[in-house]
Swiss-Prot record:
The active site is at 84 (proton donor). Its main location: cytoplasm. This is DNA dC->dU-editing enzyme APOBEC-3. InterPro entries: APOBEC/CMP_deaminase_Zn-bd (IPR016192), APOBEC_Cyt_Deaminase (IPR050610), CMP_dCMP_dom (IPR002125), Cytidine_deaminase-like (IPR016193). Keywords: Antiviral defense, Cytoplasm, Hydrolase, Immunity, Innate immunity, Metal-binding, Repeat, Zinc. The keyword Hydrolase applies.
């Protein structure tokens, strides 16, 4: 299928954009009509008659370690210039020229079409020129992605630090709420929205997968030192060793979010991550890693056990941060692993409890406690530590609203499970043990 969109434009100016003295393009408006949104943002496989590109944008600035919204609005292609380029000209003139170059900005785009290969190239050059920007691009539909040049430049976007993803229900709802003259009405998903999202998402994953393979020339790219994980936009390879790509901030906030998810569709976005830090008693630097279970394959906990077994370690302390508590099978395998290694100290923190009301899952948690594994719920100190070690040590963690309240509720729920199985005293005994290397 060949999408319908304006053809390539000629005569783009030099970079930095805006220094070319082109006329400044302005947003068409802050809000678009419901009819325009439903027609142009519908994530169809074949989008007949949709030649225009709409770009809804939000610009935030970091102020005293907190994000502050500066601008939001809507661009549309104009004078044969695509919406993305119109935005970049506008952003240069209205933001970069006005505010200090030391300011840090986050830009979020919600687009009816993903960038064409020429726009993607221009965006890459713009990001390379301005290192104080971060850019997230969510697209309703993929434009001409069968073209090798388009695929290559989408990859270059990711390699330059942009986040590129397909719009899911969460993004459609957010876009509807902020950029549509909705008259107070809630967003009503159209038929096959989620099905079409999964198709667009899988195509994008396939295109971007090579972007995330990063093996240093001095490292061996064997299966033993490559861990598979996913992120936004999904699949990524991380290399264990001195240099490890961190989780993106967007990934962390969406995947470790500890509050109750009201809509079933959002559960498809909640992935089972396992971040671990291994500290040895011989003074060596801690080892870190992040794992994610693939659908239909081994869970992250099993990948973690295989990794630790291959190291043949004895006296170590391991801290794990999980987005979901282990399933019964993973719990029993973790428990068996711990019983075979009494000198190993394993502490598991989980953001959310997985099927905690079902007896087999409760029994799995009990097997962890009975084996001597410490299982607890992530609270603000753990979220902060996870952020520092696996996301961005240079930026402070900004807690979401209600984080500590929800953590305490989840802790009470976990405590009730312990009490219902008569394990509270046992867990308290483990908590009072002196954990550490033998005293000389």
């Amino acid at each position: 299928m060949q999408p319908q969109r304006l053809g390539p434009r000629a005569g783009m100016g030099p970079f930095c954009l805006g220094c070319s003295h082109r006329k400044c393009y302005s947003p068409i408006r802050n809000l678009i009509s419901q009819e325009t949104f439903k027609f142009h943002f519908k994530n169809l496989g074949y989008a007949k008659g949709r030649k225009d590109t709409f770009l809804c944008y939000e610009v935030t600035r970091k102020d005293c370690d907190s994000p502050v919204s500066l601008h939001h609005g809507v661009f549309k292609n104009k004078d044969n210039i695509h919406a993305e380029i119109c935005f970049l000209y506008w952003f240069h003139d209205k933001v970069l020229k006005v505010l200090s170059p030391r300011e840090e900005f986050k830009i979020t785009w919600y687009m009816s079409w993903s960038p064409c290969f020429e726009c993607a190239e221009q965006i890459v050059r713009f990001l390379a020129t301005h290192h104080n920007l971060s850019l997230d691009i969510f697209s309703s539909r993929l434009y001409n992605v069968q073209d090798p040049e388009t695929q290559q430049n989408l990859c270059r976007l990711v390699q330059e630090g942009a986040q590129v993803a397909a719009m899911d229900l969460y993004e459609f709802k957010k876009c509807w709420k902020k950029f549509v003259d909705n008259g107070g009405r809630r967003f009503r998903p159209w038929k096959r929205l989620l099905t079409n999202f999964r198709y667009q998402d899988s195509k994008l994953q396939e295109i971007l997968r090579p972007c995330y393979i990063s093996v240093p020339s001095s490292s061996s790219s064997t299966l033993s030192n490559i861990c598979l994980t996913k992120g936004l936009p999904e699949t990524r390879f991380w290399v264990e060793g001195r240099r490890m790509d961190p989780l993106s901030e967007e990934e962390f906030y969406s995947q470790f979010y500890n509050q109750r998810v009201k809509h079933l569709c959002y559960y498809h976005r909640m992935k089972p991550y396992l971040c671990y830090q291994l500290e040895q008693f011989n003074g060596q630097a801690p080892l870190k890693g992040c794992l994610l279970s693939e659908k239909g394959k081994q869970h992250a906990e099993i990948l973690f056990l295989d990794k630790i077994r291959s190291m043949e370690l004895s006296q170590v302390t391991i801290t794990c941060y999980l987005t979901w508590s282990p399933c019964p099978n993973c719990a029993w395998q973790l428990a068996a692993f711990k019983r075979d290694r009494p000198d190993l100290i394993l502490h598991i923190y989980t953001s959310r409890l997985y099927f905690h009301w079902k007896r087999p899952f409760q029994k799995g948690l009990c097997s962890l406690w009975q084996s001597g594994i410490l299982v607890d719920v992530m609270d603000l100190p753990q979220f902060t530590d996870c952020w520092t070690n696996f996301v961005n040590p240079k930026r402070p963690f900004w807690p979401w609203k209600g984080l500590e309240i929800i953590s305490r509720r989840t802790q009470r729920r976990l405590r009730r499970i312990k009490e219902s199985w008569g394990l509270q005293d046992l867990v308290n005994d483990f908590g009072n043990l002196q954990l550490g290397p033998p005293m000389s």
